[in-house]
């Protein structure tokens, strides 16, 4: 009986190691941050915000992840807000931020 038990031990050990490896890989995949999500980031947009509250503006063009142009403003408070890219006030904000960036 001892020889059969010792023959099964390596198979059992390999199966246990494989199971632990799969569990660890699954947890890493579930907890890993997604760099570029395959959806639009802006579900709601603001028509405008005061320029003095904005630290930077990021414009994302349409692509496979989202069919809309997205304007995301980073505020001085650390928050991010989505702005309506077709709103007149937002267009002025983008122009001012671009002019500010090109002047520096």
Swiss-Prot record:
GO terms for molecular function: chemokine activity; growth factor activity. PROSITE patterns: SMALL_CYTOKINES_CXC (PS00471). SMART domains: SCY. This is Growth-regulated protein homolog alpha. SUPFAM superfamilies: Interleukin 8-like chemokines. CDD domains: Chemokine_CXC (cd00273). Keywords: Cytokine, Disulfide bond, Growth factor, Inflammatory response, Secreted, Signal. GO terms for cellular component: extracellular space.
């Amino acid at each position: 009986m001892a020889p059969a038990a010792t023959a099964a031990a390596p198979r059992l050990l390999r199966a246990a190691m494989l199971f632990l490896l799969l569990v660890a890989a699954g947890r890493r995949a579930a907890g890993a941050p997604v760099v570029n999500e395959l959806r639009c980031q802006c579900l709601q947009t603001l028509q405008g915000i005061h320029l003095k509250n904005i630290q930077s503006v990021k414009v994302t063009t349409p692509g496979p992840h989202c069919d809309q142009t997205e304007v995301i403003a980073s505020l001085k408070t650390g928050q991010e807000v989505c702005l309506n890219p077709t709103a007149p006030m937002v267009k002025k904000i983008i122009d001012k931020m671009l002019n500010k960036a090109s002047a520096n």
